[in-house]
Curated annotation (Swiss-Prot):
Protein name: Cytochrome b
Family affiliation: Belongs to the cytochrome b family.
InterPro entries: Cyt_b/b6_C (IPR005798), Cyt_b/b6_C_sf (IPR036150), Cyt_b/b6_N (IPR005797), Cytb/b6-like_sf (IPR027387), Cytochrome_b (IPR030689), Cytochrome_b_C_euk/bac (IPR048260), Cytochrome_b_N_euk/bac (IPR048259), Di-haem_cyt_TM (IPR016174)
Location (main, coarse): mitochondrion
Cofactor note: Binds 2 heme b groups non-covalently.
Membrane topology of the entry: Multi-pass membrane protein
Binding site for heme b b562: 83, 182
Annotated organism of origin: Artibeus anderseni
Length: 379
């Protein structure tokens, strides 16, 4: 008798995706982050759902409802901090996942890569909107500053900003719609994840060598299920440690002050995972130029497949490209640091230098280095 998991209309989809899926035998721990992102998404949706049961999206009561969740709801503090720090873990895994794709040339699967970029934008939008509901000082001013950037769009900018705000400033209407979208977007993200996996399973996984692995495949279960479970344990231990020992480590103290439109915080800055893009935005004195640079800092990933000039897919055997890749990582760390600093000397010039380097490495240095490596291969 044939196993039910191979014949049942629903189970056979699960079976072909997570059990009998042929996977390359050489996958390293860098391939764990896809499943870790799935766990993060699950944790965020569950904790968010329970938080939404006690939260009120009204400017008069929003801040107090979050306080009520932390003080009066059973394990409400745990839900709140799991949700806030879960977002940080989500972005850590997300950036490592994208970095893995860049290093090992996974971007040559263009459909999977482009859906991934859409996912990145969707998750960033979700996280930005999720920063507003606590209705603290940084929630209010962060929303005001970032949405106000859209006013740089010629002709329609001002109308667009007022349309998003639902008035002439960030107020009750803005909070309500941001909360509604913050609730809705994770489900759209889940749908996009399924499309992402669909395209991935059309081609099969890449591997560290970048060489086709068709002759040497192993079943996903039990080999990679066990490997993924180890990843889950490591990540959930890190998340639990963060939540239980220093839940406010990555947050902003200003968000414990209720939103006040008449008092501006000394340093308006987004959450740490947006600081690199914020630094690129601030490094350009022109408003429209800054907004374009901000969008391009992420959208540049879409042209990475076009810029691939190497005869090898992966960077595993390309030491010159490896040096550039790790320089890019250092530049991103520098931008993240600069994004959290005040706009004054010497931070301005450091931020501008790092921003130029970021685009220079991706657009020019990496393709040129790949061509040099191709030439060296002839020797």
């Amino acid at each position: 008798m044939t196993n039910i998991r191979k014949t049942h209309p629903l189970l056979k989809i699960v079976n072909s995706s997570f059990v009998d899926l042929p996977a390359p035998s050489s996958l390293s721990s860098w391939w764990n982050f896809g499943s870790l992102l799935g766990i993060c998404l699950g944790v965020q949706i569950l904790t968010g759902l329970f938080l939404a049961m006690h939260y009120t999206s009204d400017t008069a009561t929003a801040f107090n409802s979050v306080t009520h969740i932390c003080r009066d709801v059973n394990y409400g503090w745990l839900l709140r901090y799991l949700h806030a720090n879960g977002a940080s873990m989500f972005f850590i895994c997300l950036y490592l996942h994208v970095g893995r794709g860049l290093y090992y040339g996974s971007y040559t699967y263009s459909e999977t890569w482009n859906i991934g970029i859409l996912l990145l934008f969707a998750v960033m939008a979700t996280a930005f909107m999720g920063y507003v509901p606590p209705w603290g000082q940084m929630s209010f001013w962060g929303a005001t500053v970032i949405t106000n950037l859209l006013s740089a769009i010629p002709y329609i900018g001002t109308d667009l900003v007022q349309w998003i705000w639902g008035g002439f400033s960030v107020d009750k209407a803005t909070l309500t719609r941001f909360f509604a979208f913050h609730f809705l977007l994770p489900f759209i993200v889940t749908a996009l994840v399924m499309v992402h996996l669909l395209f991935l399973h059309e081609t099969g996984s890449n591997n560290p060598t970048g060489i086709p692995s068709d002759p040497d495949m192993i079943p996903f279960h039990p080999y990679y299920t066990i490997k993924d479970i180890l990843g889950f344990l490591v990540m959930l231990t890190a998340l639990a440690t963060l939540v239980l020992f220093s839940p406010d480590l990555l947050g902003d103290p200003d968000n414990y002050i209720p939103a006040n439109p008449s008092t501006t915080p000394p340093h308006i800055k987004p959450e740490w995972y947006f600081l690199f893009a914020y630094a690129i935005l601030r490094s350009i004195p022109n408003k429209l130029g800054g907004v374009l640079a901000l969008v391009m800092s992420i959208l540049i990933l879409a042209i990475v497949p076009i810029l691939h000039t190497s005869k090898q897919r992966s960077m595993m055997f390309r030491p010159l490209s490896q040096c550039l890749f790790w320089l890019l990582v250092a530049v991103l760390f520098t931008l993240t640091w600069i994004g959290g600093q005040p706009v004054e000397h010497p931070y301005i010039i450091i931020g501008q230098t790092a921003s130029v380097l970021y685009f220079l490495i991706i657009l020019f240095l990496m393709p040129m280095t790949s061509m040099v490596e191709n030439y060296l291969l002839k020797w």
